[in-house]
Amino acid sequence: MVRCVPHDSSSTLNTDSNDHTLVRLTAYLQGAHSSLMESNRDRESIERPLVTVVDDDVSVRESLPNLLRQFGFSAHAFSSAEEFLTSDCVSQTRCLILDVVMPGVTGLDLQRQLKLRSPALPIIFITGQKDEGIRKRALEQGAVGFLLKPVISTVLLEAVNVALREN
């Protein structure tokens, strides 16, 4: 139903025309909103470096991205190396926070694979394993950090900032 508003007698109200205008206006606004959101995403990815977390522990995957976002980073999390490798995030990631022990492809295995694809990608390992041999191998293969869980947030944030600054 069309609401009638007072108008002068020289103009007429064409409901078909108004309905089509409303549809076109709605489509235009939806398009403008989509373009704005896309533009914001593009700007966000330029202004906010993507830090990716790969860890099989759900609590880490939930908490670390939230922490990173609070401090101005864009963040994504993956439950496995395989999931990360098949995502669009590999080429966009500017710093990788990586668990050492995961089912399937381990953190050290993923590090070796990424060195072939993205040799400059800084990797910070986080682990519950107090194994000096693993730490030594990770650092020898180019890791920029090796932190024990539970990770202290200020230490992790400093490691991320240093990794991004140096790369």
Q: What positions do the PLM features span?
A:
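Acidic, metal-coordinating helix/loop segments flanking the phosphotransfer/catalytic sites
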Residues: A77-C95
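Receiver (REC) domain active-site loop signature in two-component systems and cognate sites
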Residues: M102
